[in-house]
Amino acid sequence: MKECEYQQIRPGAAPPPPPSAPQSGSGPPPTPRRPSSGPDSAALASSAASVRPCRKWEVFPGRNRFYCGGRLMLAGHGSVFALTVVLIVTTTTLFFIFDCPFLARHLTLAIPIIGSMLFFFVMSCLLQTSFTDPGILPRATPNEAAALEKQIDSTGNSTYRPPPRTKEVMINGQMVKLKYCFTCKMFRPPRTSHCSVCDNCVERFDHHCPWVGNCVGKRNYRFFYAFILSLSFLTSFIFACVITHLTLRSQGGTFLDTLKETPASVLELVICFFSIWSILGLSGFHTYLVASNLTTNEDIKGSWSNKKNMEASTNPYSHKSVAANCCAVLCGPLPPRGTSIRWPHIFPRKERILQGTWTIPSRVFTACQSSSTY
């Protein structure tokens, strides 16, 4: 399908006038001029062919960085993400070089095979989490922002009282308050929050993770959960194998001499020992969130518990079943990328609630599935 492009218009600029039709009775229409074949016409044709409309990711207002023609994105700071990659690759490389040959000879060949499978799965989940659009919602256009501001101002009852900047919607019998985002110029859909690091509104915002270099939201949460879960298995596997290697190697001498002979194994042991507890705790915490259909942001704020409210309220997004919540969080359909939607697909439509879930305005997600290209 042909890619849709758009042309950026600066805020406040007047839209280009539409072509006027010839009035009746004003004479015959002008005859088109035949283009000349001189050097000036060739230069104009080449310059017109070289000019193309800007893609949305090229003028993206957030703090993200894009690669491979907008297909990959990353947060503005990538140093912590690089540290994560270095720690995983270094520890696994040392394990394959200094521990796997001994364990494969004395125990079984399945140890390096299992380790390599876990390593490749961890790295693939990490890269998917880091380079995937987490669910960024496009900001309102100047016309949409002006129309919304006019609607908000008309709700004010007096001259000294500011107009309300919140809305209330009913979801599964529970009242949910929508807040207005002054940066994106729109009312945030339920479970949406504005990330101060990336400067974007992210749907089903969980948290901003510097270790993966990206926000964790609706579109990449399943990859993040698979990453921390597989990383906990890989760290525990390497930790157990290194202890087994050192134990078997120290049978012919003292354990201290064995540690002096294998400094690389000691380094792996230290890295795994200090990281395994936090990774296992994080995996258990997010397993509880997945089973409850909660986000880290909602759990910290106590949105559906008595941590914040005087009366305990139930989670309106929960399906009252652990299996149903896991399927909804990890296996649900993904919306199109907000950074790839073209402006011709953006047009207002009435907001509605459908089957207990919020349907965002069609200007966000009405891009056709086949035309959501980069």
What are these regions (language model features)?
Residues 2-208, 212-374:
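Membrane-associated feature with strongest affinity for ZDHHC
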